[in-house]
Amino acid sequence: MRYVIAVKSPIYGKQGAFLAYQFAESLIKKEHEISQIFFFQDGVSNGNALVYPANDEVNLQKHWQMFSITYNVPLHLCVAASQRRGVVDNLTTPTTAHYNLAEGFTIAGLGEFIAASLNADRVITL
């Protein structure tokens, strides 16, 4: 089956983002396909390069990055939610010298999410 995973939970402080990561790992192990992971609302904090976990905490951002590289799954952040929460890339910031989008993440519009959702068998939101 083909899945799209939508993550609305912040990177830390709640369990939703970590559960989404665990679910994505399980899907791949069961040989399902994930066409994209879309972060929206507070979930865009998963793509903020300025988030530094404590040494004894899981580095969830690093896990997402490795997941994306290993399984070729794009990590998309909602452009509107990102801008409202101060997560910008070199194209969406007014000053191109300052951006904080983490490596491996892409800022995208709802159109990309909807297109992927239309081609998916399941859309899961966490």
Curated annotation (Swiss-Prot):
Gene3D superfamilies to which the protein is assigned, alphabetical: DsrEFH-like
Keywords, comma-separated and alphabetical: Cytoplasm, Transferase
One function term, GO molecular function aspect: sulfur carrier activity
Gene Ontology biological process terms from the UniProt entry: tRNA wobble position uridine thiolation
Enzyme Commission code(s) on record: 2.8.1.-
GO cellular component terms listed in the entry, alphabetical order: cytosol; sulfurtransferase complex
Residue positions of the active site: 78
Function: Could be part of a sulfur-relay system.
Family label: Belongs to the DsrE/TusD family.
NCBIfam families documented for this protein: PRK00207.1, sulf_tusD_dsrE
Name the record gives this protein: Sulfurtransferase TusD homolog
Organism: Haemophilus influenzae (strain ATCC 51907 / DSM 11121 / KW20 / Rd)
